[in-house]
Structure formats: C-alpha cells, structure tokens
Amino acid sequence: MTQARLHIVEFRGFEKFITGRAFWEVPVLVQRLCGICPISHHLAAGKAVDMLAGARVLTPTADKVRRLAHLGQTLQSHALHFFHLSSPDLLLGFDAEVGQRNLLGVLAAHPEVARRGIALRAYGQEVLRLLTGKRVHGVLVVPGGINQALGAAARATLQRDIDQIVTWSQDSVTLARELYLRDEARNQAFGSFRSSFLGLTRADGALELYDGGLRARDADGATIFDHVDPVEYTRYLREEVRSWTYLKFPYIVSRGRDAGWYRVGPLARVNNADVITTPLAEAERVRFRAHGGTTPVWASLAYHWARMIEMLHCAEAIRELLADADLGGSDLVVKGERQGTGIGVIEAPRGTLFHHYEADAQGLITRCNLIVSTTSNNQAMNTAVERVAAQYFDGRAITEGLLNHIEVAIRAYDPCLSCATHALGQMPLEVSALAPDGAVVDLVRRAADGTLTRPGATP
C-alpha cells in the first residue's frame, strides 16, 4: 500500500451563507455548524463580533459567565464523545458486533460506567441550559458582552452536584488511563505518528480553553512559535485546497505545506501546556506527560486519555468559578468604536477554532473565514487512516476488521463530520482499494445500520 486518503463528501458552505448578514446575527447563525458544540461557535463568533464592535475587553461578569458556558460545553462534549461514542470501542473491543458496539452495549456490560457518562454529560448540558436558556442552540452572547448573568437559584443548582461531578471526572481519567495502558503496545502503535501540535496557552504556559496566545511545538517538543496574538494568525497559518476533498489542509507557514501540518484538540493541548491550573487535572497531566518521556505523546488513541484530563479540569474550574461573586453581576455589556475586522479564537472541545469576519460600514459581513477543529486535524486523520490501513490491509480484500479499525482511528479525533451519524456506534463508511493504475480492486460500504455491501459483487 502506498497511500490512503480520507475523502470528505459533505459540503457545508457556511462561509458563504454568512456573507451579507448583519454582524450581530453571526453568533446565533454559526451555532448551526454543529449540534454537539454549538456554544464553541457561539463564543468564537462572539469574540470576533466583540472586536467588530470595538469591545475586546469585557466586564468581569461577561467574561466569567462566558467562560463558565465554555467549561460546561467542553465538559458535556468530552463526556459525550468518551462515553457515548468511544467507550464502546475501548470497553467492548474494536471487533465487537456493530449492534453491540454502542452506548446500549456499554450499559449492558458496564452499567455503572454508562450511567456515570450520562450524568456527566447531563451536568454540562444543565450549565448551558441555565446560562443560555436551552441545552442546544441557546443564546448568551451579544456584541460586547452577554444577555444575562447567573442567578442565585441557578448557581445553587449547579453547586449542589459539582463535588460529585469532580469525583466522577477523576474516576473517568482513571478509566481512560487504565484502558490505554491495558494494551499499551497496541495503543501506542495504533495510528501513531509524529506531528506538530497547536493550541492556546496562557502567558505562563498554562492550559487555556477560552483565551490566551497561540503556541505551536514540533514532534520533539521544540517551540515553533509562542504567545502569538490570535488576531495575527494569518501570518503563521495558511490553508491549502485539494481537489479531492471539501476539507482544507491548514499548515504552519514557516514549515511549508508538506511539513507544516499539525494536530489540535485534547492531545495537542495537554502536550503543549506547561501546567494545568486546577490541582487534580495537573497531577494527571504530569502522569500523562511522563508517559511520553522526553517527547510529546504521539499516539492517536491517547486523545481519549487527554480528553478525560481536560474534562476533569473543566469540572474543577466550574467548581472554582461557581464561588465567584462576579457571575451574578449587573454590568453585562461594554461598547466601543466599530471596527472593520473581527477575529475570535477559542479552544473548542475538538481543537483550536478560528472565526474571522470583515464587515462594511453598514455592519454587513463582507468576508468570512472559518478554520474549524476538524479541518486542522484533516491531515492527521488522513495519516491515521494510512497507518491503520498499512497495518490491517492485506492488499487484496477489504475486511470488516479493517473497517472497524479505520472507524476507531477516525473517531479518536472526534470529527464533527460524523458526529451526527455514529452516535449509536454506526458510522456510515465507504472504503475502496485502488490498483496503481486506478482500477478498483475492492469496494465495501457500511450503511448507518451496520449492513455491509460490496457493490458489483456477484450474489
């Protein structure tokens, strides 16, 4: 085998949909990019709209309420991915029956784990409901601030269960670590490769999910750039278009198109951070990084372990933030002088998320550029598929085992492109094998119900 590609056939076109709309509408519109992490797009667009409104420095109440929403969003998304989507692979086995390899299968085989995952996600969703009015596609952000603070009753509701949420989150890190180390040799080799890593950090190098500067490190941990103001991202990052996929290929300018690709998300953030500011998550970060030795951790399946470390950090940070009186303040919005460009960058659950808008004098969007987390991980997913195919494809027939392993490799990156279609452990997938001359050697399709077909095969 000489090459493997992950073809993305879904076309969204949001960058064009947004053009011509009033800038203040954008934070609401872009939530429809994703049903699992809409608040991430809401907040990234909100930061860009703040800049358009000339209000980059928010009031303490607006800043902290937005941060609380982001922590709740990340907690629920990480819980959803690990327990609903990935734990069936990890607990039941990569080759388990498709009808079993889902949350219901985990509930039958490991009921306490499944119930804990459901409760963790529900708590994160409750944070969002109390702040935005709805668990999905609620509204919090307005230009220069927020539309409501956190009320006393809502704060009390969230405080009631947070200690249990922290405990369950710590148990989840233990589970993820044990699952990874249970078959360490296989998990380290599975879809593993060297790469650079990109993400936001604080000025002191601490893990940062909402604000901070851009940091990129190479596969050996050496710094490529650091403390870069996100509004300057176009000087450091570019995107390449390739004819065979709708997803672009971002890369670090100084490294060039071929060598400049990078990974984002939990693995990148935990690798890049010098410290995590909450104590339990920091202890787990130290243990995780020790596993990598003198270099960052490269294995694709280590994303799950890093994801649970971040979930623990979110739970701890929510507990700390709920004690802050500023959450209930009344100073919600600041105003400034309108600008023509707005750029907002945050760490979405799946990785660094860029929203870039330009607006005319009437406040209508004239240009939009979005670099979503899945786009940044595009080359990484292609490389993971290539590694897995090289290991499990015999050069002749595509087996169900190969499909299962490709699915596991893609799922480690938690891509938005498939989040709606594999929620029950059933990812529609088509895998074709081509000869050097382009002739199709084999073609297998897995439908959403898990049914396998070979188009053109003799009955």
PLM region descriptions:
Residues R350, H355-Y357, R367:
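A translation/RNA-centric and nucleic-acid-associated enzymatic feature enriched
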Residues D360:
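Short, acidic, Ser/Thr-enriched surface-loop or helix-capping motifs
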Residues G363:
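Active-site catalytic microenvironments in core metabolic enzymes, especially phosphate/sugar-handling
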Residues T366-C368, V372:
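Active-site/pore-lining binding-face segments in mid-to-C-terminal subdomains
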